[in-house]
Structure formats: structure tokens, C-alpha cells
Amino acid sequence: VTRVKDYAFGQVTTEAIRASKNDAGSLVDGLKEEVDGAIYTCMRSLAIAMFKNSGGARGQISAGSNVGTPTITLANVSDIVNFEVGMILNVSATDGTSGAKRAGTVTITALDRDAGTLTASGNWTAGIAAAAAGDFIFQNGDFEATKSMISGLGAWIPTTAPTGGDSFFGLDRSSDTTRLAGVRYSAGSGGPIEEILIDTAARLVREGSKPSHAFLNPLDYANFVKALGSKVIYDRASPVDEPSIGFEAVKLMGP
């Protein structure tokens, strides 16, 4: 496994340093704020990368977006949580696991977290001439010749089973995709989320696994809790001053 390095920057202006000449405490406060901000930025970057494939893409421009304007819409609206105002972006036709980024950058000046739109300081094609609908979006510096993003769950357990010629840290996992690249379970036509989780657990146990945790995004977890809530009978024999709704945690009893 190859280690990678991800960075965040903090800065204190010369003006701030000079202004605190007679008050060392104020300089310390300024430094602490910058360092805390950089640490938080690193934590956010790591949290995003933990579930990604090491390519570094934070989202994708929707097929219907017009890159000749300042505003584009994300293909997955929920990816809006990966962006912030002031962030400098690159784009590429690939997801970062291959290929190269397009020349140029754009800077986010506004975003709509409900509509899933990113607005740049100018037309996207003004900052990145070759930008196109369907391109993947990266924070500037995340898609370089030297990798800076960790290999998250999307890399260790890829959505598509590895095929011949695969090289994951030098290992061709196509010889036994389940043992070397995890289990991919398709729910087919769908169904209640609790049933899908139980079926997934059954498949994992069949392969000799001992699953201990299931990770859901907030929206899926909310739907899961609501589905379970409709099947719970609340004992009203004793009055409760502060009734509780929902669950602090959900323990799934699999095979």
C-alpha cells in the first residue's frame, strides 16, 4: 500500500502580525484560528475520500449543463456537500483514476445546496476552455501526476468487479474478485431497505465474512429509521414527560 499526502493551507497576513505587535495573545488567537481551519479542511477532505476510489473527483457536471455560462448543475445533487465558496476547481473527462485534468481552473463564487448548482466567477469555458458537460470536478491539486488522495472504499471494494489486468497496489484482483475486491450485491428491483440490508448480510456471511457495521448516508438512514418506526409498538402504559421518536442506533440481526 502506497502512502499519499493531502494538504491544507492556512495563512496569517503581515498586517495581522504587525497589528498584534503589542498584543501577543491576539496573534496566538489568529494562528489558532488558521490552524484549526486547516485541520478541519483536512478532516473534510479525508471524510470525502474515505468513500471514493482515489481519483479525487468531488462531483460531475450534469449532461444538461451549459458550461458556456457561470452556473452548472451537478449530476448528483447530493455531491454539493463536497464544495465550498472560494474553492478552486479543475475538471477532467475521467474520474481521476486515469487520464489527465483539463488546462485551467474556475473559482466558486456561489452555490445552491438545494438545487445542486455551482456558480463560478465567470463562464466555465472562460476558465477551462475544454470544459464539457459530463466532466468530473476536482478541487485544484487533487488530480495530479503524484496521487494525493487515499484509496477509499470505492477503490478497495469497487462497484464493478475487477477484470484481467487489474493492478491494485500491484495486485491483479481478477483471479478471485470476491476474496480480493469484496462483495457486490445487487438488490435487483429494489425493496425495503431493511430487507436489502439483511440480504446483503446473508451474502456476506455466505462468503465467510463477519459484517459488523453498515454505513448509510443521512437520507438513506432517515428512510431506514422511518421504515422501522412504522413497525414499532410504543408502550404507553407509563406517562413520559419527553417522548422519544426514532432510534439512537439500529442493530441489524443478520444470519
Range-by-range predicted roles:
Residues V1-P255:
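Core alpha/beta structural scaffold of self-assembling particle/tube/pore-forming proteins
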